[in-house]
């Protein structure tokens, strides 16, 4: 059955979805999810911090900002290419088929670190894995070079709604985020774009953020749904923990709005019970970050995730055949 894809959702419509009785919301999300994802497969993605700390941005949630005082804000040198590729091989052997690499940068700058990034992307793609990069803002030319290297997706999150955004970050505008996403899309690289709940936003803010995502045409290929991990030394260190069922609601609503996007269960999962995580899978999450660290915060370990997926009765890509390598040699 063909799903109706919309790009004209209003914030009011989305808030109405978020406010539905939970069982009704789950039923609607399940109906969409089973049509869009009949095999009910969950993609396993691994995430590595290639360059940690020293970021010039002042994101209130982030342990890597020079404006905050967590234990990881100091500058660390970028990892070399081969150790990164070794981690990618290990991730593949553990079952991941998408390898995401993070740089704590405000923006990509031309030079040796960017050339190394391109080599990493080519190496990951040569293993038959999807490659995703998150490294801040970039130019048209940089986006084109990443596309030529074979980059599958570029992650650049909205974080929150346009209305709540200034309470979370002041060093980059919302419009700059949207312009970065447009450059990535223009280069032919798919978008990985989502946000975070639990940062003091209202339900209306959550609906507004989802409205921005659902208005994109096409929808993002991947939509990470994060719950705040309150890190000591950041402005949000004393923020009350998010309610797990609120994250379930965000997953379900994202699935209804963007039927074919990968809704990725991301940061904050470590604080959720197995039952809440299974509800997220039922609600439409079809990807998880896999491994015990997400950049600088914790995540359930590999064996726990395998058991979780097995108990939930969903098929993960680690049970499938290995993908063929992709030749992404420099032109």
UniProtKB/Swiss-Prot annotation:
Q: How is the cofactor bound?
A: Binds 1 [4Fe-4S] cluster. The cluster is coordinated with 3 cysteines and an exchangeable S-adenosyl-L-methionine.
Domain Radical SAM core residue range list: 40-269
Alphabetically, the GO molecular function entries are: 2 iron, 2 sulfur cluster binding; 4 iron, 4 sulfur cluster binding; biotin synthase activity; iron ion binding
In short, the EC number is 2.8.1.6
User: Could you say which cofactors this protein requires?
Assistant: [4Fe-4S] cluster; [2Fe-2S] cluster
Residues given in the record as [4Fe-4S] cluster binding sites: 55, 59, 62
Bilayer-crossing regions: none
| Enzymatic reactions | (4R,5S)-dethiobiotin + (sulfur carrier)-SH + 2 reduced [2Fe-2S]-[ferredoxin] + 2 S-adenosyl-L-methionine = (sulfur carrier)-H + biotin + 2 5'-deoxyadenosine + 2 L-methionine + 2 oxidized [2Fe-2S]-[ferredoxin]
Keywords from UniProt, A to Z, are: 2Fe-2S, 4Fe-4S, Biotin biosynthesis, Iron, Iron-sulfur, Metal-binding, S-adenosyl-L-methionine, Transferase
* Family stated for the protein in its record: Belongs to the radical SAM superfamily. Biotin synthase family.
Task: Name the InterPro entries for this protein.
Answer: Aldolase_TIM (IPR013785), BATS_dom (IPR010722), Biotin_synth/BioAB (IPR002684), Biotin_synthase (IPR024177), Elp3/MiaA/NifB-like_rSAM (IPR006638), rSAM (IPR007197)
Give the EC class as a word: transferase
Residues given in the record as [2Fe-2S] cluster binding sites: 100, 132, 192, 264
Keyword flag Metal-binding = yes
Q: Report the Pfam families cross-referenced here.
A: BATS, Radical_SAM
One GO BP: biotin biosynthetic process
Chain's role: Catalyzes the conversion of dethiobiotin (DTB) to biotin by the insertion of a sulfur atom into dethiobiotin via a radical-based mechanism.
| Protein name as it appears in the record | Biotin synthase
Assembly description: Homodimer.
Q: In which pathway does it act?
A: Cofactor biosynthesis; biotin biosynthesis; biotin from 7,8-diaminononanoate: step 2/2
């Amino acid at each position: 059955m063909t799903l109706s894809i919309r790009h004209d959702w209003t914030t009011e419509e989305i808030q109405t979805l978020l406010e539905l009785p939970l069982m009704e919301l789950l039923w609607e999300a399940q109906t969409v999810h089973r049509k869009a994802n009949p095999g009910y497969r969950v993609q396993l993605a691994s995430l590595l911090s290639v360059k940690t700390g020293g970021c010039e941005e002042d994101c209130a949630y982030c342990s890597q900002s020079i404006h905050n005082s967590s234990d990881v804000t100091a500058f660390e040198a970028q990892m070399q290419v081969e150790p990164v590729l070794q981690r990618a091989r290990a991730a593949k052997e553990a079952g991941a088929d998408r390898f995401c690499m993070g740089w704590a940068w405000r923006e990509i700058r031309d030079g040796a670190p960017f050339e190394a990034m391109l080599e990493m992307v080519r190496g990951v793609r040569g293993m038959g894995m999807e490659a995703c990069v998150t490294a801040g803002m970039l130019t048209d030319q940089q986006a084109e070079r990443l596309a030529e290297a074979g980059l599958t997706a570029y992650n650049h999150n909205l974080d929150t709604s346009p209305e709540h955004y200034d309470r979370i970050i002041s060093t980059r505008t919302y419009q700059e985020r949207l312009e970065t996403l447009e450059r990535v899309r223009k280069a032919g690289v798919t978008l990985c774009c989502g946000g975070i709940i639990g940062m003091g936003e209202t339900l209306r803010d959550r609906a507004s953020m989802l409205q921005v995502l659902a208005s994109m045409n096409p929808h993002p290929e991947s939509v990470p749904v994060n719950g705040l991990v309150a890190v000591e030394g950041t402005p949000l260190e004393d923020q009350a923990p998010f309610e797990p069922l609120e994250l379930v609601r965000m997953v379900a609503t994202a699935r209804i709005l963007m039927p074919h996007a990968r809704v990725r269960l991301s940061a904050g999962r470590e604080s959720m019970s197995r039952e809440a995580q299974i509800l997220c899978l039922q609600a439409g999450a079809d990807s998880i970050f896999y491994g015990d660290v997400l950049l600088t915060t914790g995540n359930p370990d590999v064996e726990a995730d395998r058991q979780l997926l097995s108990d939930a009765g969903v098929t993960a890509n680690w049970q499938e055949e290995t993908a063929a390598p992709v030749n992404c040699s420099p032109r």
